A protein has these predicted regions:
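Short strand-edge motifs at loop-to-beta-strand transitions and within beta-strands
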Residues: 82, 89-93, 145-147, 156-158
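Beta-strand signatures of extracellular beta-sandwich domains
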Residues: 58-62, 106
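A short, amphipathic beta-strand motif
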Residues: 41-49, 59, 160
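Bacterial N-terminal signal peptides that target proteins for export
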Residues: 3-19
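Acidic, glycine-anchored loop motifs typical of Ca2+
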Residues: 111-119
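Bacterial N-terminal signal peptides
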Residues: 14-30
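A short tyrosine-centered beta-strand micro-motif
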Residues: 101-107
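Short, flexible loop/turn segments at beta-strand junctions in immunoglobulin-like
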Residues: 95-97
Length: 163
């Protein structure tokens, strides 16, 4: 090792190189590289037709029927929970690095910002709700079977209306 290799400026230069390489790798991963890897998927979720930009869209993503059916309106059993900002009547999120498989989504437009699905005395939501596959609400939460969709390796997308 030469004296130049032991200098502080040489070590700083090497550290900058490592940092730049790590930054480039993380940027490539965030732009879809992970979705091209075997067994990895990206899911873009779009909520459309929102009647107000007030509040946020609260999202719970489930990867099993048991978690979905036992969650009620809480997101504690969810694989991923998100709070999305609303812009121009839409809200979107991209879930990177998820395993391919079956998923279902429950969401609601939290109009008053209390992070809870508000209901009337009979338990009927007073805030707009939506489910994957735009499964309709008929006096009960749609079942896993009605809401389940398959995420494949690579890029996937789903749109959900909140009513």
């Amino acid at each position: 090792m030469s004296p130049a290799d032991r200098s502080p400026s040489h070590h700083r230069s090497r550290l900058k190189g490592y940092f730049a390489g790590a930054l480039a790798l993380s940027w490539m991963g965030s732009t879809g590289m992970a979705a091209d890897s075997p067994g990895i998927a990206t899911l873009a979720v779009h909520f459309v037709g929102l009647k107000s930009s007030q509040g946020a869209v609260m999202v719970a993503v489930f990867n099993s029927e048991a978690a979905y059916e036992n969650s009620g309106t809480a997101s504690d059993a969810a694989t991923r929970s998100l709070k999305l900002e609303i812009k121009d009547g839409t809200a979107s999120a991209t879930l990177d690095g998820i395993p391919p498989g079956e998923y279902a989504i429950k969401a609601f437009h939290d109009l008053n910002g209390d992070a809870k699905l508000n209901t009337n005395l009979f338990g009927i939501p007073t805030e707009p709700v939506g489910f994957s596959n735009d499964a309709p609400v008929h006096m009960h939460v749609p079942s896993w079977k009605e809401t389940v969709f398959v995420v494949h390796t690579g890029e996937n997308a789903i749109s959900i209306h909140l009513d």
